[in-house]
Amino acid sequence: PVMGVMGAFVFATQMINFTIPGTGASGHLCGGMLLSALLGPYAGFLTMIGVLLIQCLLSADGGLLALGCNIWNMAFYGCFIGALLIWKPMMRRGASKKKIVAASVLGCVLTLQLGAFSVTLETLASGITELPFQTFVAVMQPIHLAIGLVEGLITAAVLCFVYEARPELLWGTDESTQRQKARFSLKKTVAILAVLTVWI
């Protein structure tokens, strides 16, 4: 259920596009950091792939030919680079609102900068752009820096709300680790009781 709800939320936020003048491209919120912070990098990655697939099939946003690039630029960077290099190390010794805000903003800015730079490299490799590489980079990076800051603040607001209401839902924190251990202990206890019942 959480994957479906979060996927729908990210799908809706990605519909907000910002035209980048002179490039033929547009920028938008991604949601990779938000997904990975709540679902973990692997489930978040799969959810993001589902969002991108629905977009290209139903609304022709990106298209099938660009699906692989979009998965790399948004799903991979957001759900693995942001989650494993920034979110998890910062939450290792416990979560707090300050840490959540810092990790959200830093993660979103970094992953969107990586994604924007990858777009310029992919466009250059395709050979269909009329803009020089330096000009394309000079336009893409500042705009995605602003988008990253906005997305970081939105992500932080959502995650701070979750932290207050259900802190165990945050991936990579002490609370989520304790929840996983509790689930494992429960399964272990049930398994032992089942074996004893059969044995008796």
What would you call each of these model-derived segments?
Residues P1-L35:
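Hydrophobic transmembrane alpha-helices
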Residues F18-G24, V51-F80:
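Interfacial aromatic-anchored transmembrane helix boundaries in multi-pass membrane proteins
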Residues F9-Q14, F80-A83, C108-T120, T155-Y163, ...:
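Hydrophobic core segments of alpha-helical transmembrane domains in multi-pass membrane transport
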Residues P1-V5, F45-I49, W72, V101-L106, ...:
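Hydrophobic alpha-helical transmembrane segments
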Residues M74-G115, V119:
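Short helix-perturbing small/polar motifs within transmembrane alpha-helices
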Residues P1, T135-W199:
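Alpha-helical transmembrane segments and their cytosolic interface
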Residues L29-A43, T47, K97-A103:
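Hydrophobic transmembrane alpha-helices that form the pore/transport pathway of multi-pass ion
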Residues T120-T129:
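Membrane-helix interface motif
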